[in-house]
């Protein structure tokens, strides 16, 4: 018994927090992981910040599988236990923490046992978690389920969730509202995520469960409490993705401000746009086009700080001198970047094995033809492996590729790939007449806006 107490105290010591306040301001969680061959040495406690999980504390797991948290709770809300299962949706352990709670958890592989001196609303929350877990296999990466399995099950799953929501009727109105929102969000977010996962069988584009159509409304996102849920932002993101792939009218990335017509709450707009910008990998030109439309909605201090850093990174290479590389053409003649001084230079980094690269070739040919004789050079620089040099030469000849055709010396280990942090292709680079960088992640030939940019440069 003393050994158990000793190890449990150690787990609390590892949690970095101040105990200046009264014990009544804290919630206590004591846990034991009872999973055979369990290896994880640390457990994370998440809270929620702006609709996403955020680390609140960590605790070491002792050799007996025990861990513990004594966490300050300034406002009641959802927290999440992660022992390695959280991201892959193996088991949701969501707790509604309030001051003075004293919770015990015994965690098994597929469920957990809840007990303690004061568990608050968490018996009800556990039932909500069980519903989430039933949806999880359909939203898990690597799952073998398809629409053949999911569609017949969905109506039953939704009905069960709706029936459960009717039983949420405690004396705490705020809790009732938040848990009902959580259940609805779990169901919808898991369903929309299903359509983002790779599958072995696919329904027709217009073959969608009828229940999903009832979730689509003109003013979809109105409740700022969505930002109190770990999957709040994910729901918004997955919803707009689902609508786009289902053939309904939804804005493309550069028209993303139009999606805000479906979001009425200012805080939701702010957080959603921040997530879009952070994850969309926009080119400089794309961002500059959309920025004036979205910045008026990104009003929080967090978003303003984010945009400041985002723009700094986006423009970090602009104006810097381009790498003066030298590589051979198909006749083994060395060609250097400096040979093009005085002209604009557009470089296509590609390889013969790259499908998306080859899809750009017709567009590249056309743009080279249309800008022939103008003050711009088009360079195609292959990142094929050195052993495939002849394969590259044969491809260039067979496809009658125009412009300047070069091959790097060490594929992705070559100086040009390392200098511009190239880890995926196709990748395009654009330089001014002095050899300085205009964009080290330029627009593709297939993007009509590239022509607008080139025309503007050539007129200046």
What are the residue ranges of the model-derived segments?
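Bacterial Sec-dependent N-terminal signal peptides
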Residues: 1-26, 457-460
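A non-transmembrane, solvent-exposed segment enriched in polar/low-complexity residues
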Residues: 21-178, 182, 189-193, 200-204
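Alpha-helical repeat scaffolds
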Residues: 202-216, 251-259, 286-295
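N-proximal helix/coil linker or "cap" segments that precede and/or mark the start of modular domains
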Residues: 266-328, 333, 338-343, 369, ...
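Short, internal strand/loop/helix patches
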Residues: 328, 393-429, 433
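Conserved redox-active cysteine motifs that mediate thiol-disulfide chemistry
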Residues: 341-342, 349-366, 380
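Thiol-based oxidoreductase modules, predominantly thioredoxin-like and allied folds used
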Residues: 375-389, 401-412
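Non-catalytic, surface beta->alpha helical segment in thiol-disulfide oxidoreductase systems
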Residues: 424-425, 436-460
């Amino acid at each position: 018994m003393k050994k158990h107490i000793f190890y449990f105290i150690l787990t609390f010591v590892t949690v970095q927090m101040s105990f200046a306040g009264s014990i009544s301001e804290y919630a206590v969680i004591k846990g034991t992981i009872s999973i055979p061959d369990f290896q994880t040495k640390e457990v994370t406690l998440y809270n929620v910040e702006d609709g996403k999980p955020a680390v609140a504390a960590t605790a070491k797991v002792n050799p007996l599988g025990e861990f513990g948290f004594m966490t300050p709770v300034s406002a009641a809300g959802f927290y999440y236990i992660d022992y390695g299962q959280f991201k892959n949706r193996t088991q949701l352990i969501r707790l509604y923490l309030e001051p003075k709670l004293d919770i015990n958890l015994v965690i098994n592989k597929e469920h957990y046992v809840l007990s303690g001196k004061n568990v608050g609303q968490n018996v009800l929350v556990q039932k909500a978690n069980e519903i989430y877990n039933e949806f999880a296999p359909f939203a898990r990466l690597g799952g073998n389920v398809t629409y053949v399995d999911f569609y017949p099950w969905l109506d039953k799953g939704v009905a069960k969730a709706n029936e459960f929501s009717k039983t949420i009727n405690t004396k705490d109105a705020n809790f009732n509202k938040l848990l009902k929102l959580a259940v609805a969000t779990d169901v919808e977010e898991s369903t929309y995520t299903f359509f983002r996962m790779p599958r072995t069988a696919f329904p027709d584009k217009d073959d969608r469960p009828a229940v999903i159509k009832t979730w689509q409304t003109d003013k979809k996102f109105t409740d700022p409490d969505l930002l109190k849920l770990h999957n709040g932002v994910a729901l918004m993101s997955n919803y707009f993705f689902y609508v786009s792939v289902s053939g309904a009218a939804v804005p493309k990335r550069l028209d993303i401000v139009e999606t805000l017509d479906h979001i009425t709450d200012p805080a939701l707009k702010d957080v959603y746009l921040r997530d879009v910008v952070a994850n969309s990998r926009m080119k400089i030109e794309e961002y500059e086009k959309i920025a004036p439309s979205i910045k008026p909605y990104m009003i929080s201090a967090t978003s303003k700080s984010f945009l400041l850093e985002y723009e700094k990174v986006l423009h970090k290479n602009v104006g810097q001198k381009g790498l003066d590389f030298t590589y051979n053409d198909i006749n083994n003649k060395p060609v250097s970047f400096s040979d093009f001084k005085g002209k604009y230079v557009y470089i296509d980094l590609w390889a013969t094995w790259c499908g998306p690269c080859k899809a750009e070739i017709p567009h590249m040919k056309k743009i080279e033809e249309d800008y022939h004789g103008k003050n711009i050079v088009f360079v195609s620089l292959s990142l094929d492996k050195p052993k495939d040099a002849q394969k590259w030469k044969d491809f260039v000849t067979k496809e009658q590729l125009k412009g300047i055709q070069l091959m790097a010396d060490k594929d992705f280990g070559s100086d040009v790939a390392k200098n511009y942090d190239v880890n995926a292709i196709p990748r395009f680079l654009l330089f001014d007449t002095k050899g300085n960088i205009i964009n080290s992640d330029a627009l593709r030939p297939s993007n009509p806006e590239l022509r607008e940019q080139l025309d503007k440069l050539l007129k200046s």
